[in-house]
């Protein structure tokens, strides 16, 4: 996946699922499944329900994404 092809959106974490997956509600109202990016996992950043996050999505599968940033 090339960096130019990603869609970046903001959302709120609704629920924590097994295997480091999260249910995220985007600003436009859609709910997607998102996993944690490698840098967040390496730095042990905790993501809890209610956190505001930035999600990268591929234009090929708009139901899944990658959490790339957690706002403070």
UniProtKB/Swiss-Prot annotation:
Coiled coil: none
Domain S1-like: 1-72
Matching SMART domains: S1 (SM00316)
Gene Ontology CC: one annotated term: cytosol
Superkingdom of origin: Bacteria
CDD domains: S1_IF1
Keywords associated with the record: Cytoplasm, Initiation factor, Protein biosynthesis, RNA-binding, rRNA-binding
InterPro entries on file: NA-bd_OB-fold, RNA-binding_domain_S1_IF1, S1_domain, TIF_IF1
An annotated Gene Ontology molecular function: translation initiation factor activity
Subunit structure of this chain's protein: Component of the 30S ribosomal translation pre-initiation complex which assembles on the 30S ribosome in the order IF-2 and IF-3, IF-1 and N-formylmethionyl-tRNA(fMet); mRNA recruitment can occur at any time during PIC assembly.
Protein's name according to its UniProt entry: Translation initiation factor IF-1
Organism annotation: Staphylococcus epidermidis (strain ATCC 35984 / DSM 28319 / BCRC 17069 / CCUG 31568 / BM 3577 / RP62A)
């Amino acid at each position: 996946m090339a960096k130019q092809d990603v869609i970046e959106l903001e959302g709120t974490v609704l629920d924590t699922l097994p295997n480091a997956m999260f249910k995220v509600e985007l600003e436009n109202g859609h709910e997607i499944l998102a996993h944690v990016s490698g840098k967040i996992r390496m730095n042990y950043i905790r993501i809890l329900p209610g956190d505001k996050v930035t999600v990268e999505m591929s234009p090929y599968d708009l139901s899944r994404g990658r959490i790339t940033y957690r706002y403070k």
